[in-house]
């Protein structure tokens, strides 16, 4: 058993028979009253995000989660096939478990998969990935009714907003947490 003082990003808690992944946490020590821990947690199965506050020092049950590096091989219908790079075992992960990570995954890309009792819980991508723009309209510099961005389709099929100067076949860096454009990549 752990206490709320052990909470950090990535910790998986068992609460009311469900597994919850800590996305954000903040230890708060107010001037009056006892300390507490404010968290934002994602339900591992449903993906629902909730805010929950725990009193400091409260005993909590953590789940043992094994995080391993896997290589994304291919999509098989609604499922995704990954290979463990240490022993070359392949696992199949449902599309629901992969979630929004599909927007940023290319074949042969390395990802981190969290596994609990032999079941994949979620996919962890690097904070940013480099992807190619497959289609975007030409940007007209003087004709602006917005903040100077335009839609662009990535090689994964996901659409992001990019600055007007970005053209087709340009490699860009994309934030995997919110899908935002981070910059052009020069080879």
UniProtKB/Swiss-Prot annotation:
The keyword Acetylation does not apply. SUPFAM superfamilies: Nucleic acid-binding proteins, Translation proteins SH3-like domain. GO terms for biological process: peptide biosynthetic process. Its main location: cytoplasm. Keywords: Cytoplasm, Elongation factor, Protein biosynthesis. GO terms for molecular function: translation elongation factor activity. It is found in: Cytoplasm. InterPro entries: Elong-fact-P_C, NA-bd_OB-fold, Rib_uL2_dom2, Transl_elong_fac_P/YeiP, Transl_elong_KOW-like, Transl_elong_P/YeiP_cen, Transl_elongation_fac_P, Translation_prot_SH3-like_sf. Pathway: Protein biosynthesis; polypeptide chain elongation. It comes from the Bacteria. Belongs to the elongation factor P family. Involved in peptide bond synthesis. Stimulates efficient translation and peptide-bond synthesis on native or reconstituted 70S ribosomes in vitro. Probably functions indirectly by altering the affinity of the ribosome for aminoacyl-tRNA, thus increasing their reactivity as acceptors for peptidyl transferase. This is Elongation factor P. It comes from Pseudarthrobacter chlorophenolicus (strain ATCC 700700 / DSM 12829 / CIP 107037 / JCM 12360 / KCTC 9906 / NCIMB 13794 / A6).
